[in-house]
Swiss-Prot record:
<dbReference type="InterPro" id="IPR004463">
    <property type="entry name" value="UDP-acyl_GlcNac_deAcase"/>
</dbReference>
<dbReference type="GO" id="GO:0046872">
    <property type="term" value="F:metal ion binding"/>
</dbReference>
<dbReference type="InterPro" id="IPR020568">
    <property type="entry name" value="Ribosomal_Su5_D2-typ_SF"/>
</dbReference>
<keyword id="KW-0443">Lipid metabolism</keyword>
<protein>
    <recommendedName>
        <fullName>UDP-3-O-acyl-N-acetylglucosamine deacetylase</fullName>
        <ecNumber>3.5.1.108</ecNumber>
    </recommendedName>
</protein>
<dbReference type="InterPro" id="IPR015870">
    <property type="entry name" value="UDP-acyl_N-AcGlcN_deAcase_N"/>
</dbReference>
<keyword id="KW-0441">Lipid A biosynthesis</keyword>
<dbReference type="GO" id="GO:0016020">
    <property type="term" value="C:membrane"/>
</dbReference>
<keyword id="KW-0479">Metal-binding</keyword>
<comment type="similarity">
    <text>Belongs to the LpxC family.</text>
</comment>
<comment type="function">
    <text>Catalyzes the hydrolysis of UDP-3-O-myristoyl-N-acetylglucosamine to form UDP-3-O-myristoylglucosamine and acetate, the committed step in lipid A biosynthesis.</text>
</comment>
<feature type="binding site">
    <location>
        <position position="238"/>
    </location>
    <ligand>
        <name>Zn(2+)</name>
    </ligand>
</feature>
<feature type="active site" description="Proton donor">
    <location>
        <position position="265"/>
    </location>
</feature>
<dbReference type="Pfam" id="PF03331">
    <property type="entry name" value="LpxC"/>
</dbReference>
<keyword id="KW-0444">Lipid biosynthesis</keyword>
<feature type="binding site">
    <location>
        <position position="79"/>
    </location>
    <ligand>
        <name>Zn(2+)</name>
    </ligand>
</feature>
<dbReference type="InterPro" id="IPR011334">
    <property type="entry name" value="UDP-acyl_GlcNac_deAcase_C"/>
</dbReference>
């Protein structure tokens, strides 16, 4: 039996909000089986809980944001959710004392470290996977994203930027997911942005917390960060990281192949919504025997922490 997972103990971290520039404290706590991921705004009185579900994603401009019916939001969830997905955390309560998750270093790596520090605990209930039964596709102009059947979880992602530095890098990655591959090859990829856009955003009181400490910054020709890139193909890998986080609002790890061209938060969420709306396109499955589990999910998360 493959079991659901939560964290063993509460852990906290403090960072800055990407858009506000203000200090943000984040706490991750264990949760009972079948809870899913629930985010809680503790800066409000009373505190407001928002379950992480696809229909709660109501803002996808520059980030993924959960918004409840009263308009209360928690923004920039995607890097944290990529870490939760990558380490196979099914259940957790996440408290934050601000309208956004701290940006940390612009990747999922600090959240991976935080979850590893908390420890991962198996729970007395079967883990459920969302198995793709037939292709589901969404399009927006020349951009598109698709989920189709596959035994495991494979990502086939291509970006297309005319910027000379990005054009020189590899812009197409195909990888079979595993916790180890996520931690080593994807989790450290940082968000990236262009100086021309940053100047405009700050003039409009956005990206006030953005800096070279938490993003790859480019001018018209090159990367401006003194230490350069973490991966030769960091740009496309960060887009994969974002997609991991965006897809996890489906509520379960996906068994299927995710293929995408030039997608972002909006199209990723549209794909999840389209999938869940077509109930003949998926089913929830569990695995009684570990031998039956696809290789992508067969190694417990803790195995890569030793």
């Amino acid at each position: 039996m493959i079991f659901q997972r939560t964290v063993q103990k509460m852990v906290k971290a403090t960072g800055v909000g990407l858009h506000s520039g203000n200090k943000v404290t984040l706490s991750i706590m264990p949760a009972p089986v079948n809870t899913g991921i629930v985010l809680v705004r503790t800066d409000l009185s009373p505190a407001v809980a928002i379950p992480a579900k696809a229909e709660q994603v109501r803002e996808t401009t520059m980030c993924t944001a959960l918004v409840n019916d009263e308009g209360i939001r928690i923004s920039t969830i995607e890097h944290l959710f990529a870490a939760l997905a990558g380490l196979g955390i099914d259940n957790a309560v996440i408290e934050v004392d601000a309208p956004e998750i701290p940006i940390m270093d612009g990747s999922a790596s600090p959240f991976v470290f935080l979850l590893q520090s908390a420890g991962i605990k198996e729970q007395a209930a079967p883990k459920k996977y969302l198995k793709i039964k037939r292709p589901v596709r969404v399009e927006d102009g020349d951009k598109w994203a698709e989920l189709k059947p596959f035994k495991g979880f494979r990502v086939n992602f291509k970006i297309d930027f005319a910027h000379p530095e990005i054009a020189r890098s590899q812009q197409h990655v195909v990888m079979d997911f595993s916790t180890s591959a996520f931690v080593k090859e994807i989790s450290r990829a940082r968000t990236f942005g262009f100086m021309r856009d940053i100047e405009y955003l700050r003039a409009n009181n956005l990206a006030l917390g953005g800096s070279m400490e938490n993003a790859v910054v480019l001018d018209e020709y090159r990367v401006l960060n003194p230490d350069g890139l973490r991966y030769e193909d960091e740009f496309v890998k960060h887009k994969i990281l974002d997609a991991f986080g965006d897809l996890y609002v489906a509520g379960h790890a996906i068994l299927g192949e995710f293929t995408a061209y030039k997608t972002g938060h909006a199209l990723n969420n549209q794909l999840v919504r389209a999938l869940l709306a077509q109930q003949d396109a998926w089913e929830l499955v569990s695995f009684e025997k570990e031998a039956d589990v696809p290789v992508s999910f067969s190694v417990p998360s803790g195995a890569v922490f030793a």
